[in-house]
Amino acid sequence: MSRKLRYGLSAAVLALIAAGASAPEILDQFLDEKEGNHTTAYRDGAGIWTICRGATRVDGKPVIPGMKLSKEKCDRVNAIERDKALAWVEKNIKVPLTEPQKAGIASFCPYNIGPGKCFPSTFYRRINAGDRKGACEAIRWWIKDGGRDCRIRSNNCYGQVSRRDQESALACWGIDR
């Protein structure tokens, strides 16, 4: 079984990569699978009010309890958030990247942990120094949620471990060939 399949990338994500899809297409599919698309506000694992694919703000205003959006509005919000994440990658990652690599880094850094945690990270230092394998290893270290070790299944955050494996697989896509 290939390394990519072991890391649990879905058949849909693998098909997009095989077809030569763009980073926005790959990232959309990946985030739909990881975040879902909720048209009613909910609290995320950290207790923050979110909507759509994890947006915390809509039209410049914070998400509030009871907020509801149409699927079409969520699609627009999701596109804005996706494009911001990919623009962050283009601006801040100084090594050439493939489309799957852009999607993996966009999901991990700006989209999930946030730039404030990414900039001082070992991942960020390693990727920009050209140590791609080391950077991908460092993604997999981010497996705590609110201080809980997500490798312990009873902490109810094991999805974080799987997501980091998958983001690492995308961010390193093709470097082992």
Curated annotation (Swiss-Prot):
Localization, per the record, is: Host cell inner membrane
Question: Which domain of life does this protein belong to?
Answer: Viruses
Its membrane topology, per UniProt? Single-pass type II membrane protein
Location, primary (coarse class): host cell
tRNA processing listed as a keyword? no
The record's Gene Ontology biological-process terms are: cell wall macromolecule catabolic process; defense response to bacterium; killing of cells of another organism; peptidoglycan catabolic process
Q: What is this protein called?
A: SAR-endolysin
Gene that this sequence comes from: R
